[in-house]
Design a protein with these regions (language model features):
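Residue-level marker of positions within ordered structural domains that often coincide
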Residues: 5, 63, 125
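Left-handed beta-helix
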Residues: 24, 30, 35-36, 41-50, ...
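Conserved beta-strand-loop-alpha-helix hinge in the C-terminal portion
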Residues: 116-137
Length: 140
């Protein structure tokens, strides 16, 4: 509606965009191309750049960013295929391609292309550091 529409359709697109942003905290830039079946079960904190080209049946969880990085050329896009599930707190950045039937785990950082029929996770390490007992050391 916004890209190829008449003046009235573009104005309506701007109005819808502002309403989505203010009511739900969703920032989908005008110019993003999204196929049917977009599912956003928890809608807070969603950001999608106008450089996104998204297929059908995408599921986005809360606090997900599909964004471009500085220095992208005019013809660089983030391409996301069909039947993609993106977990919460995920950041997808740059001119990359995500294939069909991909699952991206929560809290992932994606800056490289992902082939079709894949599961992508960002490995994180956790470490528990014990607190020194200051009484035993005579510090207190």
């Amino acid at each position: 509606m916004y890209i190829y529409g008449s003046k009235k359709q573009k104005k309506t697109g701007l109005w819808i965009n502002r309403k989505l942003n203010s009511k739900f905290g969703i920032d989908i830039e005008l110019g993003a191309v999204i196929g049917y079946g977009l599912d956003i079960p928890h809608h807070m904190g969603i950001v999608i750049t106008k450089k996104a080209r998204i297929g059908c049946n995408l599921s986005l969880k809360q606090n997900t960013t599909v964004g471009n990085k500085q220095g992208l050329k005019e013809d660089d896009f983030i391409i996301i295929g069909n039947n993609v599930d993106i977990g919460a707190n995920t950041c997808i950045i740059g001119s990359i391609t995500i294939g069909d039937n991909v699952t991206i785990g929560a809290m992932s950082f994606v800056n490289k292309s992902i082939p079709a029929n894949s599961i992508y996770i960002t490995k994180k390490t956790s470490e528990v550091i014990p607190v020194i007992n200051h009484k035993k050391m005579g510090l207190i």
